[in-house]
Design a protein with these regions (language model features):
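Active-site nucleophile loop of the alpha/beta-hydrolase fold
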Residues: 14, 39-42, 92-101
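The conserved beta1-alpha1 loop
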Residues: 10-14, 70, 129
Length: 194
């Protein structure tokens, strides 16, 4: 898969969706070739439905995709990667919700995504974590990044890196995204030289 040309960006909200004050919305208006991957029921549905929605978006085009996932969507992306493949160049995985932890209620949407897949992702990725996220301890973020073969970025005290964090356009996140795209392109050039 060539990632030297055009890319498309898929914004994948977590449980409950990304409200109007979420950085996802700010990015939607400024990223080229950007589209939403929204669940029919962002507060419900099954893991299989979430994964199928991601698969439909990824395979809708042969243009390589950069997945930009938040919270539960990060875990859905990891589940997608264990069962499917498609033209994914990279993934920015922001505040993956640790669905294996005790905060998730037994009958909640989050528990439907257990266990968190701990297999390497077949594309370049960055996990972004906050130091005071109630849904993801830094040590667990480190475990996810290691298992997934991702780089870990600690973004400071920004809660769950969602609307409540008041990140607006989240310029630091755009830096991570630029780095991720650059890494994906460099890796592709390395493969082309082999």
């Amino acid at each position: 898969m060539s990632v030297n040309g055009e890319l498309r960006y898929l914004l994948i909200p977590g449980g409950g969706g990304s409200g109007p004050d979420h950085w996802h919305h700010r990015w939607a208006g400024s990223l080229p070739h950007c589209s939403w991957v929204e669940q029919d029921d962002p507060e419900g549905g099954s893991r299989a439905e979430w994964v199928a929605t991601i698969n439909n978006a990824v395979t809708a085009s042969s243009t390589p995709a950069v997945l930009i996932a938040h919270s539960l969507a990060c875990i859905a992306v990891a589940h997608w990667a264990t069962a499917h493949d498609g033209p994914v160049a990279a993934a920015l995985l922001v505040a993956p919700a640790d669905v294996d932890d005790d905060w998730a209620e037994p009958d909640s949407l989050y528990k439907r995504f257990q266990p968190v897949p701990m297999d390497p992702l077949p594309f370049s990725s960055i996990v972004v974590a906050s130091t005071n996220d109630p849904f993801l301890a830094v040590e667990r973020a480190r475990s996810f990044a290691t298992a997934w073969g991702a780089k870990l970025e600690i973004a400071g005290d920004h809660l769950h890196l969602g609307s409540d964090a008041l990140l607006d356009t989240w310029p630091e996140g755009r830096i991570y995204l630029r780095e991720l795209v650059g890494r994906a392109r460099s890796f592709n050039q390395h493969l082309d030289s082999l």
